[in-house]
Amino acid sequence: MISTEFIKNHLRKILSIRLRVKLGLALRHRAKGYAHLNGFGLEIGALHNPAQLKNSCTVEYADAINKSEAMHIFPEVNPKDLVDVQYIIDLDKTGLMALKNTHYDFVIMNHVIEHVANPIDVLAELFRVVKKVVML
C-alpha cells in the first residue's frame, strides 16, 4: 500500500507544476491538442487544474485521492478549484480496471505517467478504455 506521505510528496510536486500552468508560465501547446477533443472523456490526476476543454466535451475525473483528502493534504488550494473525483484509482495496482472497455472518446493525463511504475501497462489500459485512438 502506498503511504500517505508518499502521496503527499508526489502531489505537492504536481501542485507546483500546476500552479505554473495556472499562472501561464508553463507549456501552452496543450490548447492545440485539446481543440481536437470532443465527446465524453476521462481526466486522470486533474486535482485543481483540469484541462480547459470546449463545451462539447463532458469529463469524468479519476485520481489517487478524493476531494476531501486533497483538501486535507493541500490546505493552500482553494477547495472550489478541486475537481470532484468519480473514480479513486491506483494506476500501479489496479490500473483502470473499474472502467469499461471502449467507454471514453478521450483520456487526458498531464504529469501522471512519469510517476507510475510501469507506464506500458498504463498505456495498455488507456487503449482499452478509449473508443479509438487518434492522437497521443
Q: What does each model-found stretch correspond to?
A:
Residues 1-35:
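Membrane-proximal basic amphipathic "stem/tether" segments
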Residues 35-96:
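Class I SAM-dependent methyltransferase SAM/SAH-binding core
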Residues 36, 102-103:
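Alpha-helix C-terminal capping/helix-to-coil transition sites in glycosyltransferase folds
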Residues 54, 117, 131:
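Short conserved AdoMet
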Residues 104-108:
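Hydrophobic beta-strand segment of the Class I
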Residues 111-115:
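A short His-aromatic
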Residues 120-134:
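A short glycine-rich, Lys/Arg-flanked "PGG" loop and its adjoining helix->strand segment in the class I
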